């Protein structure tokens, strides 16, 4: 249960996991911040979603299909379309979640996304975004099977550099990592290793001490071996 956000997760006896959420609305104190949540009608709930494809609902009472933003049309076209012009300014992490969906499901961003995203990538907007949320969204992205495609989409949009100060390294080093527990953290360290100033980026992301120590040890070992990860 997450009372503050009005959400819960239920594991049914036969193994199915169901996420439940109250109909609610969110208010962002500043761009990228954790939202303040309160109960609201379903119409208000849908208008806060990231993209039209996840702004659809079914009224279980009358089985009416609610699709105020053309989500079914965009779903059929495999398009990720934000709901309003300030969607990314309101929450810059929306583009990271969108890149994950696009990479995982073979979707693409709507043609207006680069134009709508540009104001959200301005330094003054990024400076106000929650670094903890940015970090968590990056880690979730690195857990994806198609994580490199998601990173490439973010790089293509200019979001990887603007939001994280990261350049996209070659894919080959990542392919050598085997799937195991903690894989997203290993991918994150490898991603940081290929930056011009890995420790500065790690500090900016406010990584836990154990990860920064691990990165420092990795860098020291590479220096000793006469190697460099910077691109």
Indicate where each model-derived feature is located:
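Catalytic cores of the polymerase beta-like nucleotidyltransferase superfamily
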Residues: 1-231
């Amino acid at each position: 249960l997450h009372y503050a956000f009005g959400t819960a997760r239920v594991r049914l006896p036969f193994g199915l996991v169901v996420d439940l959420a109250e109909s609610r609305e969110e208010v962002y104190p500043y761009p990228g911040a954790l939202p303040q949540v309160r109960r609201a009608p379903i119409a208000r709930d849908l208008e806060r979603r990231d993209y039209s494809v996840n702004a659809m609902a079914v009224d279980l009472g009358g089985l009416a299909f609610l699709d105020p933003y053309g989500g079914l049309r965009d779903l059929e076209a495999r398009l990720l379309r934000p709901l309003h012009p300030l969607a990314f300014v309101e929450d810059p992490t929306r583009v990271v979640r969108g890149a994950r969906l696009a990479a995982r499901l073979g979707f693409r961003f709507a043609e207006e996304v680069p134009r709508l995203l540009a104001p959200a990538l301005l330094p003054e907007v990024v400076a106000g975004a929650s670094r903890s949320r940015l970090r968590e969204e990056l880690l979730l992205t690195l857990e994806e099977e198609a994580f490199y495609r998601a990173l490439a989409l973010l790089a293509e949009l200019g979001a990887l550099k603007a939001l994280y100060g990261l350049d996209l390294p070659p894919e080959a080093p990542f392919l050598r990592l085997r799937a195991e527990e903690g894989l997203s953290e290993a991918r994150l360290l490898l991603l940081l290793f290929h930056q011009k100033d890995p420790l500065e980026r790690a500090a900016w992301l406010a990584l836990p001490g154990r990860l920064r120590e691990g990165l420092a040890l990795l860098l020291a070992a590479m220096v000793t071996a006469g190697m460099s990860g910077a691109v």
